[in-house]
Amino acid sequence: MAESDRLLGGYDPNAGYSAHAGAQPQRIPVPSLLRALLSEHLDAGYAAVAAERERAAAPRCWQARAVSWMWQALAATLVAAVFAAAVAQARSVAPGVRAAQQLLVASVRSTQAAATTLAQRRSTLSAKVDDVRRIVLADDAEGQRLLARLDVLSLAAASAPVVGPGLTVTVTDPGASPNLSDVSKQRVSGSQQIILDRDLQLVVNSLWESGAEAISIDGVRIGPNVTIRQAGGAILVDNNPTSSPYTILAVGPPHAMQDVFDRSAGLYRLRLLETSYGVGVSVNVGDGLALPAGATRDVKFAKQIGP
């Protein structure tokens, strides 16, 4: 024992340790402040207060959830009731709607039948008037000259039927292919139709320029007041719907007409559509083409000739 140890009362703090263990300093674990900040976010007091708050709020939370579930159930019940009422009303109204539709369809068909009957009667009376007029005017030379002039005017006005040689132009619309990805393949957006009203208008004008004396499209005579226009997916000729294939009859000198029509803008347009879209085009010479008279028009102006 060293002298200094005896002066301290004879106590040796390294007694019982080896020289190496006795010389090793004693380590006292000190908690790391950084580790405490990362692992212990709240003080024990704060944690206790938070836990107490959660225990106090638990009953209120269950009450709020119960109220929310109750409102949701009430809303679902109201929605189901509204849908049930709508279905019941639709079922009760459906028979009446169908009956009204059937009545409207029957009325439209009846009106169409009456209009067709009146149109036929009007055409019959017009033919009788024409026959009587010819009988009366055929007695003298002045009347015959007047009849000849009336025949020329009737041909120009498309008010008399015509039979004679001419050209038959048939145009077939193939419709756009359903698997085309190029938008330019559709001439009208959202429509499968290739032949349009302006194409038929150009063909008719080209036939007039070629020397045609009378023209008809699908049995409808082309006259001064006749229009060719587009109405959705249909082409109306004098308000009569037509469909492919479009048959255009032109009465006149067939060979001279064909020579001019082959170089016309109308046939050029059809050939271009034939190449680009596969439109069917045929031009044939025929004899004995029969064109009906045009629809009878209302007389708006008249002038008396003679006493």
Swiss-Prot record:
Keywords, sorted A to Z: Cell membrane, Membrane, Signal, Transmembrane, Transmembrane helix
InterPro entries: DUF881
Membrane topology listed for this record: Multi-pass membrane protein
Entries under Gene3D superfamilies matching the protein: Protein of unknown function DUF881
Pfam family, one: DUF881
TM ranges: 67-87, 152-172
PANTHER family: UPF0749 PROTEIN RV1823, UPF0749 PROTEIN RV1825
Protein name, as recorded: UPF0749 protein Mb1854
Taxonomic placement: Bacteria, Bacillati, Actinomycetota, Actinomycetes, Mycobacteriales
